[in-house]
UniProtKB/Swiss-Prot annotation:
The gene is pyrG. This is CTP synthase. CTP binds at S14, D147, I148, E149, K187, T188, K189, P190, T191, Q192, K223. Pfam families: CTP_synth_N, GATase. It comes from the Bacteria. One of its GO terms (cellular component) is cytosol. Residues 1-266 are annotated as: Amidoligase domain. L-glutamine binds at G352, L380, G381, M382, Q383, E403, R470.
Length: 545
């Protein structure tokens, strides 16, 4: 079967939810038995999001093969079974750096390097490479039509549609259809102008996804179809909903998947959305609720912890619980004290970088340990739990990480200089290495200790989880901390690096060096998050007695 391409663009305003719409359509097509993948093309000039501020860009999602990518790839993996790779996300910066590398190497034989054809050809080559082996590839272009940054991507996709044939390509455009209260009606003019902008660069959309706070009336959909030269059945109303996991059913109810299959002449069974119906049923019918305190430094933008937020919700689904997340700035713990932690059922300290707010996180871990509050530490959340235990239990009063104090006397966490990657190759880093692309990244094996809580939760001896960090537990000082009672219950493939720690004589205190949130999905959940939320609910029931 020839690969079919769906190109997704957005107009009028940004943040319309192109990624969610693309992932939802992919979920329906996957439910029809098709092999689907999704790509995200980002117009910014950074090579990848790895060094971008989480408060500007949101979280960095790490793929199985170690790519630092846009958070939309997290949405893709949560909606479909296909795992994303380095091929599924690239930026203007990555395209330009590759073209310039080829130019320096002499690949272009002295030609003048131009946006057309060299940049557009590189974009097309990467899209085609990422589509290999799939029935349908959905390609989302970041930004808004009309932005200067996205023009090379749109031109490349226009050319690609001509090359592979319009019978194998479909353009899907998301627009805003605002409701004007004073007029008492929705307005279609912004959509018409957005389509006009798209037409000016040679692209005629085949499907319009119209975002609004309500369903768009049939007469307005007919009007949009007429003036935008689109089939009326291809004008899809996408209203605001309580849960993003309602979107697949909403799109299917309007026949979007049927339209796509007919366009590509695909014969496949009806979509079976039973799993998504079960997700929505659990979400709508919780048997209880818990409040989780998330203590971090990027709390002003919840998207900085997008996958963690979603993983907590998935754990709620697994346990039939409604999970309320209370965001707590770790600096508030430093300035206001542990009073800000009162009234929560469980504490989660996620990953992060830099010294700001670290002492607040350490006090948070101490509060959770001493007050028997369920605690889940992720990446930095594990490291600060180790520092706290070393200082207050193991007698290493000057314990710290060399990330925060390069001259600390007792660096229980230190810069990792050498480790093995998933293929068994040795990676080496130093203090002088660049910030971008120099971390321990991607899926790594972890051995779980028999009899541990982690082993009980996962139900197997060996697991694979994703990493994104530079610093590791210092094995030189580890014996003294273990002697004081701390349990190391997860080790790397070569059994040299600490992956999971547990505090004994505590209802639930588990911390891991990896990022379990990247592999949690609404249909399957994740054992660590499920166990944590269950423990938090047990704690909640005690507190209300």
């Amino acid at each position: 079967m020839a690969t079919n391409y769906i190109f997704v663009t957005g107009g009028v305003v940004s943040s319309l939810g192109k990624g969610i719409a693309a992932a939802s359509l992919a979920a329906i097509l996957e439910a029809r038995g098709l092999n689907v993948t999704i790509m995200k093309l980002d117009p910014y000039i950074n090579v990848d999001p790895g060094t971008m501020s989480p408060t500007q860009h949101g979280e960095v999602f790490v793929t199985q093969d170690g790519a630092e990518t846009d958070l939309d790839l997290g949405h893709y993996e949560r909606f479909i079974r296909t795992k994303m790779t380095k091929r599924n996300n690239f930026t203007t910066g990555k395209i330009y750096s590759e073209v310039l590398r080829k130019e320096r190497r002499g690949d272009y034989l002295g030609a003048t390097i131009q946006v057309i054809p060299h940049i557009t050809n590189e974009i097309k080559d990467r899209v085609i490479a990422g589509a290999q082996g799939h029935d349908v590839v959905i390609v989302e272009v970041g930004g808004t039509v009309g932005d200067i940054e996205s023009l090379p991507f749109l031109e490349a996709l226009r050319q690609l549609a001509v090359q592979v044939g319009r019978e194998h390509t479909l353009f899907m455009h998301l627009t805003l259809v605002p409701y004007i209260p004073t007029a008492g009606e929705v307005k279609t003019k912004p959509t018409q102008h957005s389509v006009k902008e798209l037409l000016s660069i040679g692209i005629q959309p085949d499907v319009l996804i119209c975002r609004s706070d309500r369903m768009i009336p049939p007469n307005e959909r007919a009007k949009i179809a007429l003036f935008c030269n689109v089939a009326e059945r291809a004008v899809i109303s996408l209203k605001d909903v309580n849960s993003i996991y309602q979107i697949p059913a909403l799109l299917k109810s309007q026949g979007l998947d049927d339209f796509v299959c007919e366009r590509f002449r695909l014969t496949c069974p009806e979509a079976d959305l039973t799993e998504w119906e079960q997700v929505l049923y659990k979400q709508a019918n919780p048997v209880g609720e818990v409040t989780i305190g998330m203590v971090g430094k990027y709390t002003e933008l919840p998207d900085a912890y997008k996958s963690v937020n979603e993983a907590l919700k998935h754990a709620g689904l697994t346990n039939r619980l409604s999970v309320n997340i209370k965001y707590i700035d770790s600096q508030d713990v430093e300035t206001k004290g542990v009073e800000v932690l009162k009234g929560i059922d469980g504490i989660l300290v996620p990953g992060g970088f830099g010294y700001r707010g670290v002492e607040g996180k350490i006090r948070t871990a101490q509060y959770a340990r001493e007050n028997k509050i369920p605690y889940l530490g992720i990446c930095l959340g594990m490291q600060i739990a180790l520092i706290e235990y070393a200082r207050n239990v193991a007698g290493l009063t000057k314990a710290n990480s060399s990330e925060f104090d390069k001259d600390c006397e007792q660096p229980v966490v230190a810069l990792i200089t050498e480790w093995q990657d998933a293929e068994g190759n040795t990676e080496v880093r130093t203090d002088e290495s660049d910030l971008g692309g120099t971390m321990r990244l991607g899926a790594q094996q972890c051995h779980l200790v028999s009899g541990s809580r982690a082993r009980e939760l996962y139900g197997k001896e060996t697991i694979e989880e994703r990493h994104r960090h530079r610093y590791e537990v210092n094995n030189t000082l580890l014996p003294q901390i273990e002697k004081a009672g701390l349990k190391v219950t997860g080790l790397s493939a070569d059994k040299k690096l600490v992956e999971i720690i547990e505090v004994p004589n505590h209802p639930w205190f588990v911390a891991c060096q990896f990022h379990p949130e990247f592999t949690s999905t609404p249909r399957d959940g994740h054992p660590l998050f499920a166990g944590f939320v269950k423990a938090a609910y047990e704690n909640h029931k005690k507190s209300v007695k």
